Amino acid sequence: MISSATKTLQTNNKTIYVAILSTLTFFLFLDYIPGLQAWSAWVTPPVALFLGLIFALTCGQAHPKFNKKTSKYLLQYSVVGLGFGMNLQSALASGKEGMEFTVISVVGTLLIGWFIGRKIFKIDRNTSYLISSGTAICGGSAIAAIGPVLRAKDSEMSVALGTIFILNAIALFIFPAIGHALDMTEHQFGTWAAIAIHDTSSVVGAGAAYGEEALKVATTIKLTRALWIIPMAFATSFIFKSKGQKISIPWFIFFFILAMIANTYLLNGVPQLGAAINGIARKTLTITMFFIGASLSLDVLRSVGVKPLIQGVLLWVVISLSTLAYIYFV
């Protein structure tokens, strides 16, 4: 029988949960009010994820069923909305240059990630694969798209996303400094940043800090790599199908493709509409990160340990050095 003190604690935790979620949502949508946009700048996916993690580790899981169900569907809707931020023609055009290296780097990252995660550190399959996918393609967006196809648990998503976001934050500060130390041209740095930094947002930030040409090169190359979400999602559904289990067709990826096509050919005359839908999708993705973080438990975190972070760091270092070698010697 639950004591009155326990009931009071659970009620308080649920109140705190609602307060955090309401605050995040409130500040997120201040972005649409002229003059108040700056107030929403701090609400980013990493911040939302870590707020969810802090809540879960200090207060426990207030609404586990709500978190699980909401994060599942909101994540898929958000991925579809992200398609309205991509131009298919631009991505394909930028992909013609260096296509061979793009293919090699994506496939190579997945294979190296598998070896480090599964063979060396014995990390669970889903977490290791999500970290490798995020490193190979476009960070959190790739994990958001691949996770539902993989039927990954919220705890596995949290660990993978947390690893990627930590490395993203580090890259945003150290990459420009390393680029200047190595006297890299803006084109070289843009190429390196697009391949070695996970999330598009951090790629854009690092490119902008280095120079205008670096920003342009980094953005176009990263856009091309983001298209790999599509074949990766379908390949994942086939590769990880259990014996006797039907193939899980990632239908939301079809809608992602349709959104991208619509944005390229139907909304090219009204780019504001595509940008608005994409903006809402990014905000719902940020809220989803809170749900995913709030689903983690201290027991899960203890069982996982630091191995996923070590996999992410080692994989990141290997890809960064390999890309540098390609830029300088090929």
Curated annotation (Swiss-Prot):
Q: State the name under which the record lists this protein.
A: UPF0324 membrane protein BT_4609
Upper lineage is: Bacteria, Pseudomonadati, Bacteroidota, Bacteroidia, Bacteroidales
Family, according to the entry, reads as follows:
Belongs to the UPF0324 family.
Specify where it is mainly localized: membrane
Q: Which organism is it from?
A: Bacteroides thetaiotaomicron (strain ATCC 29148 / DSM 2079 / JCM 5827 / CCUG 10774 / NCTC 10582 / VPI-5482 / E50)
The entry's localization annotation reads: Cell membrane
One Pfam family for this entry, by name? Answer: Cons_hypoth698
Q: Which UniProt keywords apply?
A: Cell membrane, Membrane, Transmembrane, Transmembrane helix
Report the InterPro entries cross-referenced here: UPF0324_pro
Residues crossing the lipid bilayer are 16-33, 38-60, 73-95, 99-116, 128-150, 160-182, 189-211, 221-240, 247-269, 284-306
Please give the GO cellular component terms listed in this UniProt entry. plasma membrane
Topological relation to the membrane, as annotated: Multi-pass membrane protein
Q: List the disulfide bonds.
A: none
